[in-house]
Every structure is written in C-alpha cells, then in structure tokens.
Amino acid sequence: MSKEIYEIERKFLVKEIPNNLQQYKCYKIKQGYISTNPTIRLRQRDDEYILTVKSSGIMKKLEYELPITEEQFNNLWEKVEGNTIEKNRYLIPLKDNLVAELDIYGADLSNFANVEVEFNSTKDAILFTPPDWFGQEVTQNKRYCNASLAKYGLPSKK
C-alpha cells in the first residue's frame, strides 16, 4: 500500500560521530535516482524496496512512497541516472522523542556523514536545538540533498 506524507526535516553535517554506534538500530541502504526533477528515488533498505516521489521544497516536502518487489526494484534500477548512494543509517534517539538519522556513506562518498531529524510540524523543526555532535546545518543547501550527492558528488569546500 502506498502512502503520501509531508516530510518535515532538518539536515546537518556531522562534527563528531557518536561513540558506540553498534548499540543503535542500523539499516544498510542502497539508493539511486530515476529523475532528480521531480525527485524519483529507488531505495533498498535491508530487504525492503521502495519507490519514492518527492516534491520540491526546503524543509517541508510532499513525499509519496510505494513499496515494490525486489524484481520491480531490479528492473527499475536499470533506469537510474548517475551515481548511486550506499550508506549505513543509524537511528539515534534524541530528547523529545526525536530520532537522529545518522548516515555514514560508502563507495564514492566514503568518509562523508550527515544527520537528519524529522519533525511532526514546522514549528517543532524551527524550535529544535541540535546536540553538540551535530555540525553545520545544510537544510537549505541543495548541494547536500541525496539526489545532488548522487548526481554531482560532494560539494567542493570554498
């Protein structure tokens, strides 16, 4: 069954990766993009396969997710544009029942990490104070969205 949701999130670079990552739930993720405008993403998360369409937006985006089979995933994977992303996503509990999704990338993006936090409302997102291990906020920098990372790689530091 498909689901349509608004995704409200903030994204940060990582100043310091927390210790003892093995104590947190971790997903192995492989994803690629059939299109980046609009964003049409294929994702394998462990043994789960999802086709996602996202609207444009900065902090708030409409997201439509459709579970697909492994066979459908493999057939659609041939349509992926550019590079793919491989990452481990760690779910780290924060205060106020929030969860930090720490992504540590592999392959072409090795040694890169970022962290996202999803919120129930824009107000909650605005009021959020990131923990000390979070680095610079990049929510409004489209160069750090996964579609851009897949298409262009890491932004150059200027």
Residue ranges: model-predicted function:
Residues 1-158:
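Phosphate-end processing signature that detects enzymes handling 5′-triphosphorylated RNA
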